[in-house]
């Protein structure tokens, strides 16, 4: 199957990522473009697992509203499809926090948890940390994070959730 023939396929279980040529140029059209990057992520994960001699793990944490919980499920599904195994944040190779800006308590918890992740990343420098959600759409928040929390690898808002596979591939 060629990637161009799969672009209408919405059931990820029916897509054979191993048949996608990740050495070709990524398709311009969505969702074929994201399938390409899911395949690329899977190959990256497999290679990293061979190097480490163990499975790569991930942790998804949601702060805030029910909409975030739904988005986090989608993100966790993409991580699983790429080959990550769910784990606690202490053991995770990739941690993603889905943030909320509406609930101030959630905002404060994110900043507190970032200090905790910073300590974990000192012990595991290969750990990747991502922040997403509506809090990441506020320019002043993003600037603060980029300046004061430079250990964070990926920051993206809700308008880029559909590009998560592409953004994830860029982290490695």
Predicted regions and their residues:
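Cofactor-cradling patches in redox/metallo enzymes
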Residues: 1-167
């Amino acid at each position: 199957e060629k990637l161009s023939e799969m672009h209408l396929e919405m059931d990820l279980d029916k897509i054979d990522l191993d048949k996608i040529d990740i050495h070709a140029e990524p398709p311009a059209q969505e969702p074929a473009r994201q399938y390409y990057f899911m395949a690329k992520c899977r190959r990256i994960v497999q290679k990293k697992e061979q190097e480490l001699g163990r499975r790569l793990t991930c942790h998804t944490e949601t702060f805030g509203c029910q909409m975030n919980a739904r988005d986090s499920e989608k993100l966790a599904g993409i991580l699983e499809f790429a080959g990550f195994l769910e784990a606690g944040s202490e053991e995770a190779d990739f941690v993603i926090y889905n943030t909320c800006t509406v609930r101030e308590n959630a905002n404060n918890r994110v900043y507190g948890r970032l200090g905790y992740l910073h300590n974990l990343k000192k012990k595991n420098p290969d750990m990747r940390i991502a922040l997403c959600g509506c809090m990441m759409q506020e320019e002043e928040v993003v600037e603060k994070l980029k300046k004061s929390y430079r250990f964070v690898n990926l920051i993206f808002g809700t308008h880029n959730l559909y590009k998560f596979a592409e953004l994830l591939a860029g982290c490695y």
